[in-house]
């Protein structure tokens, strides 16, 4: 390992900020909340006097495991073996804290699918099909084992406050008034797995489509793949040449969890 090259690499932050004012929570899941627990001094605030046991600040967070930039472990869609549930199997024991970190990093292959972004109908996602990936390979070379495929949809532009931010998830999923984000079909997940790809990332709310999110999760996670969702800044990466890293919070028996995604670019 060339430590000098590593130390001089440019770091690109691929994580989105989590806030009560931003659309980072899947509709119907636990709402994100961030509140103060202890303040430097007892002062009057909008909800009363702050707690202050000592002169320091600490806050507490309530959030869904799949809020903000996060990853899906197999247990997100694979029930535990012996549960008697459909699709149960050994991967149902691979919780987030048991996913090896090396599975969440590798050379990045950025597949630009922004051209699909305006092709969805209200409440429906345009699908990224195997032929889209094959066309990318014809131009950029075959995908290699352990490469991390990052789908650049451009959907992160809707991760904003206010009415415009409703296009990120609320419009496609709740009201059905706006199109869904581009998302890989189940067949695409299988194709990537057959190419030796372990991890897929996307700069959109989910690897799953707005209209049928479950099958692609069952196909991919059921094969031991890992999905990293709600990324950003994929436009700062070359098609190839960056090294992707996702470092999740190590939560016992989780179905995945939030973390920090980044890419290392050699100078």
Question: PLM features: residue spans?
Answer:
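Active-/binding-site microenvironments in catalytic and ligand-binding cores
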Residues: 1-267
């Amino acid at each position: 390992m060339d430590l000098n090259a590593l130390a001089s690499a440019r770091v690109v932050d691929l994580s989105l900020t989590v806030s009560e004012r931003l659309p980072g929570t899947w509709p119907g899941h636990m709402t994100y909340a961030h509140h103060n627990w202890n303040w430097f001094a007892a002062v009057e605030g909008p909800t009363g006097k702050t707690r202050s046991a000592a002169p320091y600040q600490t806050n507490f967070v309530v959030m869904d495991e799949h809020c903000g930039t996060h990853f899906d472990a197999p247990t997100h869609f694979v029930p535990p073996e012996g549960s008697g549930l459909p699709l149960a199997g050994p991967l149902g024991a691979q919780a987030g804290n048991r996913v090896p970190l090396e599975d969440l990093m590798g050379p990045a292959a950025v597949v630009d699918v922004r051209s699909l972004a305006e092709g969805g109908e209200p409440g429906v996602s345009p699908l990224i099909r195997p032929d889209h990936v094959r066309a990318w390979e014809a131009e950029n070379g075959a995908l290699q084992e352990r490469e991390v495929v990052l789908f650049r949809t451009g959907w992160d532009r809707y991760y904003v406050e206010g009415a415009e931010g409703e296009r990120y998830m609320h419009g496609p999923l709740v009201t059905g008034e706006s199109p869904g984000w581009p998302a890989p079909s189940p067949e695409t997940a299988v194709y990537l797995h057959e190419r030796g790809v372990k991890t897929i990332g996307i700069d959109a709310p989910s690897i799953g489509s707005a209209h049928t999110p479950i099958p692609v999760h069952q196909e991919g996670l059921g094969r031991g793949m890992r999905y990293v969702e709600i990324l950003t800044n994929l436009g700062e990466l070359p098609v190839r040449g960056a090294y992707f890293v996702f470092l999740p919070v190590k939560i016992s028996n989780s179905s995945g969890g939030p973390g920090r995604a980044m890419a290392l670019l050699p100078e």
